[in-house]
């Protein structure tokens, strides 16, 4: 058989990736055929190339390696150890399920490692050994269930850790041990049921903590104790969080606090009192209905308050009392009908005011906004009037400096309807005083006691929602003059009403209430002054008769004994002195009483 007719050797087709892996690499070597390379910086871009293994022949001076969006399933020990100058490695959106200990050995210059969008399940010790210079680690969108003790112990330079969108249910107390420089930690969209306080306490340099979209219903007292350097805390989308424990933020020295899209029904004043360095407070999208007066005053350095998208219906006068540095308020998209100037300690210092999306009534209470409208930053949507009807829908910036008659005016409060001026009630009975008024804006109704104290909405003597004064179980001390005061921002009016209490005399000489009885048990019986005199007379006469009779019998017995002797003589024998042989009888006479 000649060479021309001899059968050719059939070589099996080699996979192209195998050739890539066999290509030699050296300093400044050629770029792998399946990748794109740049020189400034020294980057090898192999993303979204359907790769199932790391290509060979990577230049040794590579500073950025992008392997994202491929089909890599694992990293073996030492696979990238020759890339000692590598600073950024992107392995995101592959199929990595395991990382062998030492997989990143030799990457002592690596600063950024992106592993999001893989299938990693457990982070154990030794996985990140050799990454002594790493500053950013992104583990989002994996299937991580738990962090074991020492999982990040080799990352002494790590500053930012992202671990959101995992199945995380447990963080061991020592999981973050060794992260001495970690400054930013984000835990979001996990299955944690409690805040891992013991693990967080191992982060002495933590500055920013973000806890987002967690099904945690309580932040217990001391949960974040030990984070003395923490400045920014964000709690976002905890639908089960209805309140903060008073000691939940103890030990923190925050400058920014955001608790948004939770279920807080009121501002957590008790938990905030000690945060004297707080500058930014964001409570947006919580069902908070009011900001009361003077409750924020302990936050002396507060500059910004955001409470947009809540349920605010009122901001009280002096609500921001004591906040001398306050300059930004965002209360957009609420149910506020007004915002009075007296809420602010210095309205002229206000720089930014977000007030759009509120049903504002444009009356005299908003004149101060007209005065400052050219200097205030209202954002993209300036506030607009929802009433009265002749200005409805008109933006505050559309009004001229000279207002037409009837614009932005108020009507003083006047009492229009009241009950009788003199009310008589029996002791133990029920008394009601009615009082209401007219005005624009609608006035509030208050009542004052006879001794000058204002009455509240609870107790035996209380003011009802419609302004009616109710006194239950009337007592003698309730008598006197009660003053009804109706007031609004334009003025006030008052009316005095008297209450006279009739003391109820108990029947049959008793002071007890005959209507209050217990079946089968006789009630207490009390005597009046006449009854007491009769009892004393009945008891004293028999006693006096008995004493007189006794003395009479004694006198008769004494008379029957004859003449009364007043002296008596007694004979006695005295001791005889020695030598005295002539001793006669001795006698002594005693006087009888």
UniProtKB/Swiss-Prot annotation:
Organism superkingdom: Eukaryota
LRRNT domain: residues covered: 29-60
Cell compartments where the protein resides: Membrane
Transmembrane segment boundaries: 534-554
LRRCT domain boundaries: 358-412
Domain (Ig-like C2-type) ranges: 412-502
GO terms (BP aspect): positive regulation of synapse assembly
Protein name: Leucine-rich repeat and immunoglobulin-like domain-containing nogo receptor-interacting protein 4
